[in-house]
Amino acid sequence: MSASEQGPKIKYGESAPKLDKAQLQFMKLIEEQNLDRVQKLKRIRRNNLLTAGALGVSVLAIYGYSIFSVQQEKFLDDFEEPKKVSS
């Protein structure tokens, strides 16, 4: 983009209104609350990932056990032909 497409440059330092002490304290309070919220969300996300991992491992373990315990070869070894009835 060229300079004409970007728009005019704004100099904030010269024309920006000065913030009073109450506004600065309010900004710090909001920033602290936001940091607390971010930490809480990170903790919740970590716990959700751990729970999802545990559930995934459990599902794979149950699936693996069921495949191992009911193998096709063992299942067909016990199969007997039905006896034919002679009339």
Swiss-Prot record:
<keyword id="KW-1133">Transmembrane helix</keyword>
<keyword id="KW-0496">Mitochondrion</keyword>
<comment type="function">
    <text>Plays a critical role in the biogenesis and activity of cytochrome c oxidase (COX) (complex IV).</text>
</comment>
<dbReference type="GO" id="GO:0005739">
    <property type="term" value="C:mitochondrion"/>
</dbReference>
<dbReference type="InterPro" id="IPR041752">
    <property type="entry name" value="Coa3"/>
</dbReference>
<dbReference type="InterPro" id="IPR018628">
    <property type="entry name" value="Coa3_cc"/>
</dbReference>
<dbReference type="GO" id="GO:0008535">
    <property type="term" value="P:respiratory chain complex IV assembly"/>
</dbReference>
<feature type="transmembrane region" description="Helical">
    <location>
        <begin position="47"/>
        <end position="69"/>
    </location>
</feature>
<dbReference type="GO" id="GO:0070131">
    <property type="term" value="P:positive regulation of mitochondrial translation"/>
</dbReference>
<comment type="similarity">
    <text>Belongs to the COA3 family.</text>
</comment>
<keyword id="KW-0812">Transmembrane</keyword>
<keyword id="KW-0472">Membrane</keyword>
<keyword id="KW-0809">Transit peptide</keyword>
<dbReference type="GO" id="GO:0033617">
    <property type="term" value="P:mitochondrial cytochrome c oxidase assembly"/>
</dbReference>
<dbReference type="Pfam" id="PF09813">
    <property type="entry name" value="Coa3_cc"/>
</dbReference>
<protein>
    <recommendedName>
        <fullName>Cytochrome c oxidase assembly factor 3, mitochondrial</fullName>
    </recommendedName>
</protein>
<dbReference type="GO" id="GO:0005743">
    <property type="term" value="C:mitochondrial inner membrane"/>
</dbReference>
